[in-house]
Amino acid sequence: MATIPSTSWRSIGPMPGSRPVPDRTTPVSERDEPHRLAHRSGPPSLWWLGWALLRLFGILALLHGIFPYEHAFSSSSDLYSYAQWSHDLWSGLLPYHDFALVYPPGVIVFLGLPPVSTGVYIAEFLSVALVADALIFRALYRSGRSLGAVLWMIAPTALGPIFWARLDIFVAAALVAAILCIERRRYAWAGILLAGATLVKLWPAVLIVLVLRAIPRRSWRRFLLAATGTLVVAVLPLMALGGGAGLWHSLRSQATRGVEYESVFALPLYALQTAGHFVPIVFGLSVNFAGPAADHVATVSDAVFVCALVFCLWRALTGRSPGADAAGWLLLLATAIVLTSKVLSPQYLVWVSAAVALVVDRASRGIRLAVVTVLLLVATQVQFPLEFYQMVLGTDLGLPLSALHAIVVVFFAAIAYRSVTLVPAEAGPAPTMRPARELEGDLAPVTVPMADPRPVA
């Protein structure tokens, strides 16, 4: 050991053969994740121009059915339901009591837009959706995720105009904001945002548990109190006003849905159809298969889905962190849902795209993950809305399109899983160092290890 003045040992640089000493004056978040601090301002003007042009095309496709959507099924159908619910709410009716809602209570926030008319409500909804879209794009770029921002920019074109016509765009915004809050150690805000996402789509409740692995134990209480408090404040008033039975009926209806035609588990049912068996497709909360065969497949799907969630929780409880951060847990959970759920609506790919965009810049197979994500979006758009009628009317294209989509989903799941579990060394935590003992003053000596005198191989 040797002693040198504390004012000079930083300036002489690393000694031959020694490990680099981390700069203790730099915040841990900046040392560990320099890529996330690469951009102090928003995306350049050309990036915003590309974003705006793709959004203009998407909105025109949604509202006016321009090429190639002239004969495709309309993606705006749910917007009319939202407008009707908004009218009921503004008329003084109580959700879940006076009229039925098929979503959790978080949807009420978006029903609060003034329903001057159906057209005005749709314009308001799409405007808010575009704002959420822009905020996600800006947040991804500012956090140093350039590849993620590019992926998010092109995702609507690959998936189709349904991108802004469902509530999932707001779920994606809440998830991105929550992950960034965790990275910046704003755990209370992260809990509030994840609870908000849970109030629109139930599955983020599982993420609240998973991301505890990315939060220091001393901050768990603050995070969990914020999340549970938000859920209680949102649900208790509805229960007190008599909406409890309607809310429970809505949740039970979601749980008992059949196998949706876009699901991986729809493939054997399409095969049965092609073989001449009667397996009808019905329209309800979703477009799903019905009949005894579909019920058996749905039971298997539910079992596999539960096993997938248990697997995610097991990895969290055993400390097997994918990517060692909250974004990795989000992608792992989103992948499990897409792969194993009997309900796979196209809009689910909105928050899947957000999850990939958060991870892709630091993933071990980033480019490959981005490419397969785009392929998944395109394959999903082919099923809905482009070839929707071919899928539901029992034509010969149903089976090959379902098989193609299932193969892409499985391939995506494999790449995504390996991307968050095989993280390159440079993406991990920076090496730590025991603090040196300072004796007195700026020139007090500190003890540092001498370099290994043996030559470096």
Located regions from the model:
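Periplasmic/ER-lumenal interhelical loops and adjacent helix-loop junctions
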Residues: 244-301
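N-terminal secretory/membrane targeting signals
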Residues: 1-2, 232
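Low-acidity, Ser/Thr- and Arg-rich intrinsically disordered low-complexity segments
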Residues: 2-11, 18
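Multi-pass membrane glycosyltransferase architecture that uses lipid-linked
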Residues: 16-252, 297-457
